[in-house]
Amino acid sequence: MARILVVDDEPLISAMTEDWLSELGHIVVGPAHNLAAALKLAEADLDAAIVDVALGKDMSYPLADALSARGVPFALTTGYGPEGIEPRYRTHSKLGKPFEFATFRRVVDELLAKGRTREACNAAP
């Protein structure tokens, strides 16, 4: 059971993401619907995050920076395709909206595997 931050300004997508994470047995942190709330929630103990690129008038890159600095793996969600993501984040996991459950599950599994790899490296002497 992992603690996963959900950040999306679209209530239907946020609710779907929460439901799917719960169905997969994970603990949902949030959801946050704006950048300020997301930055506050990002201070929690997290295993991963699902982050919408565009949050109303704000972009989520300050949150992506904060998560990266803490070593928290995250996936960016967007309806704009790869060109809608800043170049420095194009190699991160992505979920193109609308996304299906099978794709979502695969991305969550990949994020959690990255987190376990990070923890193993940090624990090594």
What residues fall within each predicted segment?
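Conserved acidic segment of CheY-like receiver
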Residues: 2-11, 17
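Short hydrophobic helical patches associated with two-component signaling proteins
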Residues: 16-21, 104
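Short hydrophobic/Thr-rich beta-strand motif most characteristic of the beta2 strand and flanking loop
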Residues: 26-33
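Active-site beta3 strand of CheY-like receiver
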Residues: 45-50
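Conserved phosphotransfer microenvironments
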Residues: 51-68
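Alpha4 helix (beta4-alpha4-beta5 surface) of REC/receiver domains from two-component response regulators
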Residues: 62, 69, 80-97, 102, ...
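C-terminal output helix
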Residues: 84, 99-125
